[in-house]
Amino acid sequence: MTKLYRIEGTFRYEGEKYECDVHSYGTLEVCKIPGAPEECDVDLEYVETENCIEWDEELEDWHRIEACDLPEDVVEKIEGEALERLRVGDYKEVCLIGTKE
């Protein structure tokens, strides 16, 4: 079964606080920032990772999980080190917040 994870919450961009409005693009979930380019080439200054949710196929809805400790095979399939750095709290320029694979 395909597992879909995403980190949901707030982030700061250019000093302004935004809620994370997530849209799906192919197999990746990205954060759409108001006024940002479609390719989401922006700097996220701060991302709260305590709100981690997982897609439940049976319920067909998101449900919250206790921690953002994603399986290593999931992390390995994410482009770059974006989510890995989020997991360890080393925030960097990142747009990617999840994966379907």
Predicted regions, residues:
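Short, charged/polar N-terminal "headpieces" of proteins
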Residues: 1-34
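Acidic, low-complexity intrinsically disordered segments
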Residues: 31-101
